[in-house]
């Protein structure tokens, strides 16, 4: 039986995407593995750490855009490694120059090197400035529903709460906060950080997240390209399960076969 599923696209800053899996480009062994994993993931949006990855600022060095060309992928520059609003804003402006006026950016302002938790005060400050400067801001933040709403009200194009600390692989630690963020949001909510395996991605999507962004879960796997393929399927399955609607949880059994018309 061929079940027809209605078109279900992710829309960010007015642009439509068929894939809800966003991937990072760091930690792979080389650019070829980056390309293969990105293609296996089916990702259309790929995020790039401007302070760590060459996209043209270092002529003569391998350029990520040679394997992930902007004609095929939406390049999402990020401010990884920034610890102040000023550094983050400066990095975004550099990225816009390198990408010929590209305004979509991923903002992250970190609090310290141990936890890599977001510094929410600096994040709010940077988000306000970037929105004023005409950027379409996708913002990495904590799983605080009040803060998520504030970032939406500032004008961020997407809010990206963490599932767990960056690179930890712990999976979603607070489903209830995520649910509240999702229920209150009028912009896409994309889980960012902490995903460890395919089931984590599926759970995020089943909760109603609009997408999942990951890097370490794929790049750090024993077989990154295979894991990328698994993550693609998990995100798709989780989204379909969310749209289908899970059955209610009950304390007691409920027979799956009707009792009417029993013989004997």
Swiss-Prot record:
InterPro entries: Aldolase_TIM, Thiazole_synthase_ThiG, ThiG. The keyword Nucleus does not apply. The active site is at residue 106. 1-deoxy-D-xylulose 5-phosphate binds at residues 167, 193-194, 215-216. It is found in: Cytoplasm. CDD domains: ThiG (cd04728). Pathway: Cofactor biosynthesis; thiamine diphosphate biosynthesis. One of its GO terms (molecular function) is thiazole synthase activity. GO terms for cellular component: cytoplasm. One of its GO terms (biological process) is thiamine diphosphate biosynthetic process. The keyword Acetylation does not apply. It catalyses: [ThiS sulfur-carrier protein]-C-terminal-Gly-aminoethanethioate + 2-iminoacetate + 1-deoxy-D-xylulose 5-phosphate = [ThiS sulfur-carrier protein]-C-terminal Gly-Gly + 2-[(2R,5Z)-2-carboxy-4-methylthiazol-5(2H)-ylidene]ethyl phosphate + 2 H2O + H(+). Its main location: cytoplasm. Catalyzes the rearrangement of 1-deoxy-D-xylulose 5-phosphate (DXP) to produce the thiazole phosphate moiety of thiamine. Sulfur is provided by the thiocarboxylate moiety of the carrier protein ThiS. In vitro, sulfur can be provided by H(2)S. Homotetramer. Forms heterodimers with either ThiH or ThiS. This is Thiazole synthase. It comes from Stenotrophomonas maltophilia (strain R551-3). The lineage of its organism: Bacteria, Pseudomonadati, Pseudomonadota, Gammaproteobacteria, Lysobacterales.
């Amino acid at each position: 039986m061929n079940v027809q599923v209605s078109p279900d696209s992710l829309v960010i800053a007015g642009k439509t995407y068929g894939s809800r899996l966003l991937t990072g480009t760091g930690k792979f062994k080389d650019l070829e593995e980056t390309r293969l994993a990105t293609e296996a993931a089916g990702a259309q949006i790929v995020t790039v750490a401007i302070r760590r990855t060459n996209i043209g600022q270092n002529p003569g060095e391998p350029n990520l855009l040679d394997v992930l060309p902007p004609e095929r992928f939406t390049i999402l520059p990020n401010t990884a490694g920034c610890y102040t609003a000023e550094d983050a804003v400066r990095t975004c402006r550099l990225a816009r120059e390198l990408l010929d006026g590209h305004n979509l950016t991923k903002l992250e302002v970190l609090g310290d090197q141990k936890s890599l938790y977001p510094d929410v005060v600096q994040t709010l400050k940077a988000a306000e400035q970037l929105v004023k400067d005409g950027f379409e801001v996708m913002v990495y933040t904590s799983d605080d529903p009040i803060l998520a709403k504030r970032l939406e009200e500032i004008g961020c194009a997407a809010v990206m709460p963490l599932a767990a600390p960056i690179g930890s692989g712990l999976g979603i630690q607070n489903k209830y906060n995520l649910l509240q963020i999702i229920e209150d949001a009028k912009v896409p909510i994309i889980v960012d950080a902490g995903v460890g395996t395919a089931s984590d991605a599926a759970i995020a999507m089943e909760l109603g997240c609009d997408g999942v962004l990951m890097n370490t879960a794929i790049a750090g796997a024993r077989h990154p390209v295979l894991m990328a393929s698994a993550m693609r399927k998990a995100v798709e399955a989780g989204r379909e399960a969310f749209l289908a609607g899970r059955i209610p949880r009950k304390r007691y059994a409920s027979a799956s076969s009707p009792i009417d018309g029993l013989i004997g």
